[in-house]
Amino acid sequence: MFWIYADSTYTVIFFYRDEAPKPTVALEYTFGRRAKGHNIAKDVGHIWELGGGTWLSKLMDIPLNPSTLLHTTLVLVLDLSAPNEMWFTMETLMTAARARIDSCILEMKADDSKIKEKLHKKAWERVGEDHPDKNMLDPMLIPLVIIGTKFDVFQDMDSEKRKVITKTLRFVSHVYGASLQFFSIKQEQLISKTRGLISHHLFETTASKTLQTDYNKPLQVPAGLDSLQQIGNPPLSEQDIGRVHAKNPMELWKVAFTGFFPQENTNNPGTVKDPAKDAQFAEPSIDKLRMQKDGVCYSFTFKQTHLYE
């Protein structure tokens, strides 16, 4: 399983660990085990987490590779309280993930020339081969889960904003053949539901078929159970729809969403918290040298700045 744009909150909760969640720095690995009945042997689930901003998306090449692709579920974590970053984050990471998957498939074709067709078949089995929206869908070739976090903050937002965000995420999830789940670390019921969803993908436990699409409540939409008719039109007036030049429905929804929530670029390393200053990575001897070096740099910069005053 591969989480992108995540922090350790989710693995700490999922594995019932008694520790404080910490921000994920770049790419991190952890694992969990689950007992198999009365057997001594346990199932092992491998989890990679990518954090630190969209500019690190190239690191997904490590966990997503030809040897792991057939056993990988992609989990995209989106912050519901930050809609002005949501589309940019989602689009950047999904584009990178799809490109990496295509690259892996090219390598895998050397051993199995029909690997892409097999993955397509599995994708449609997840969504439903007879789904009425089939001609409008473009499911990911590996299982995809989209988790909207900070529902506790989101539920206090303006109702119109919540409606736009929920409809848009339902549309994107539906087109990509993803399961959609809203989550809050402060609500035990949502923790339990998210834990069940992750357990299904990690250990093949029974999946919940509960469908919740009311924008006033936390969304829970299993892959293939939504429909374009139920989602409705993008949040644009009929007059605006006629003026928008979009190549496909996804672009139309992008125009609608970004018109409502102008996007901020999160692809800047400068906006990411410096892990070197994080207490969890403290190294006294190295930190002392770093302080000395920073002091020298500051002194030099100060002198250069005031040289011609």
Q: What does each model-identified segment do?
A:
Residues 1-179, 184-193, 198, 270-280, ...:
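TRAFAC-class small GTPase G-domain
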Residues 203-273:
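Eukaryote-biased recognition of long, low-complexity, charge-rich segments
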